[in-house]
A protein has these predicted regions:
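C-terminal interaction module
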Residues: 1-38, 156-349
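Internal, hydrophobic cores of structured domains that mediate oligomerization or house catalytic pockets
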Residues: 36-170
């Protein structure tokens, strides 16, 4: 997104965090009750990280709202909050904001970023809530592009030593798992391209025009949900649930999800085909990583298939669950969330 140095966008970020924190706190307490425990007064977040400061226990930290309002526009706002048990560890819950200073933004040093995560079980026990957060947050911010699906959380303070694990899980479970820091500089400098397609996708009006407009996208409504994003943008859900990949038998590479392959084909003009490295690793690391341009480009191309094989992927798509049953629930959850955030509510299909 853009303009994270402005008071208006900072307020929108605070509203996004408030709704995220409310959703995960409600879920956290429900899990405690189900386990026969007394629900805690707080949610699952445990650690607070701010630019230039040591990690602070979440309940002793100044809080995101305060920093969002007090960090001046000429300074970068960089904050992360996690459910990690230790400050050097990671957790299932993570809310991270990186917003450039005004002078860096004016010099086009990159876009700003918001990343948030929940455990996989959250999607099952709170159906449509994560999709609603993605949709509403994209609407609340001056979004350029965004995506959501499966990924591996790594410690905010110790990313490089854990990149090998991130890469291992992506290789083990499939190409549907995202790799790399979403706040990485080369990713934030994608103004006219997107890093990847995913389960949930957000595109601004300029990107939609680059692919020929929303009406040009051949995405059957039984398997894809499309909703308008403000000012001509588009929200796209590919498939009923996020997927890492499809098993192709013992000893064979995991096959990418059909919905992702077909969405990648539809958005090919705006999907990045080259990028600087997605990982760095450590000086003594010998594990395979996306730490070379060649490896990174191989990952960027992982959903590309020959034109003469596309019909096979359409056949595979028809074997997957349809999105028709959850379309109404997502629209309703999104409407409620937009209302709570004080945003205009447009009719959704």
């Amino acid at each position: 997104f853009r303009n994270g140095f402005t008071a208006e966008v900072r307020r929108a970020l605070v509203r996004c965090f408030e709704q995220y924190n409310a959703a995960i706190t409600d879920y956290h307490r429900a899990l405690q009750e189900a386990a026969g425990q007394t629900p805690s007064k707080t949610g699952p977040l445990r650690w607070f990280y701010a630019e230039g400061e040591d990690p602070t226990a979440y309940d002793q930290a100044p809080g995101f709202e305060r920093l969002a309002h007090t960090v001046p526009a000429n300074q970068t706002l960089a904050v992360a909050m996690t459910s990690a048990e230790h400050k050097l560890a990671t957790g299932f819950y993570d809310f991270t904001v990186f917003a450039l200073s005004d002078w860096k933004a004016e010099r086009k040093r990159g876009l700003d970023g918001l990343a948030f995560s929940v455990p996989r079980a959250f999607l099952l026990h709170r159906p449509a809530v994560f999709q609603a957060m993605f949709n509403a947050f994209a609407e609340a911010l001056p979004t350029v592009h965004g995506h959501a699906g499966f990924a591996v959380n790594v410690p905010p303070m110790d990313r490089r030593p854990n990149e090998a694990s991130e890469y291992f899980y992506a290789r083990r479970f499939g190409p549907g798992i995202d790799v790399g820091d979403p706040m990485r500089s080369n990713v934030r400098k994608l103004f006219t391209k997107i890093k990847t397609v995913d389960w949930l996708n957000a595109l601004d009006a300029d990107l939609v025009r680059e692919v020929g407009g929303a009406s040009s996208l051949v995405l059957p409504p039984d398997w894809f949900i499309r909703e308008p994003l403000k000012n001509g943008g588009l929200l796209i859900q590919a498939g009923a649930a996020p997927e890492s990949g499809i098993s192709n038998g013992p000893g064979k590479p995991v096959v990418p999800p059909a919905a992702y392959v077909l969405l990648n084909q539809a958005l090919r003009p705006i999907v990045a085909d080259k990028l600087d490295t997605l990982q760095d690793g450590t000086l003594d690391s010998t594990a395979p990583l996306l730490s070379t341009v060649v490896a990174t480009e191989g990952w960027l191309h992982r959903f590309n298939v020959p034109e003469d094989q596309l019909n096979l992927w359409w056949v595979e798509l028809h074997k997957t669950p349809k999105v028709t049953d959850e379309r109404t629930a997502i629209a309703e959850q999104t409407r409620k969330l937009l209302e709570r955030m004080g945003l205009p509510v447009e009719p959704r299909s």
